[in-house]
């Protein structure tokens, strides 16, 4: 199977009602699917945390680096697997999880220079709870990270001029066509933003990058994913996103289905990220 077909299979398994409270069967199904996929490449660590007495789970796969680089700080890549009630959540965030699962395959079979830690986060839609718990745990363990990358909605693309919105005043600096993938990072990540963007453009997907100071507090929309708790604890972190509701009219709607996605775009994003992560110095 080629990459696009693999991504399509993941999407068809993950895109379903899976709110942790109102669609418990779907939520458990997706959790198990991720666990099974990860377990092909190594032992899966489960990070359990409680929310209102409910046990929630982040799923973690550690992949070692190529031979001589085992001691380097890991690159953490995360994607949330929960969804809001009433939507199959194809773009939000089956796309991010599908790419996470394929990057697991790529880097398990051909390791990167850095060790990788792949994390499927729970409870993002309830206030970034899974990533906040995990970031706090790493911080407490004094675990350094080379970079944290949050995969947040990677599959919606619209090449009609005027299809892309921005929080003001960003519209003055960025294109009004929603056909690019955005990389948003704290100031520590500027070199990585430039380099990852370049790798994504190389595979033919337009890419724009935005560095934000002060933990993104000025433009709050930059904080709406699992990278934000890492920013707050001083880690270098980047969100990769199709910009969600600033572009995708199906955001948090029943219509956020696989048919609304652009699979060529999603596949390109996945390829570009793989190449980009391999090129990080």
Where do the protein language model's features map onto the residues?
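Acidic/histidine-rich, surface-exposed loop or edge segments in extracytoplasmic proteins
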Residues: 10-20, 79, 174-179, 253-254
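Active-site-adjacent substrate-binding region
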Residues: 162, 166-281
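Structural recognition of the beta-strand scaffold that forms the well-ordered cores
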Residues: 60, 75-78, 117-120, 146-151, ...
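Proline/glycine-enriched tight loop/beta-turn segments at coil->beta junctions
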Residues: 66-74
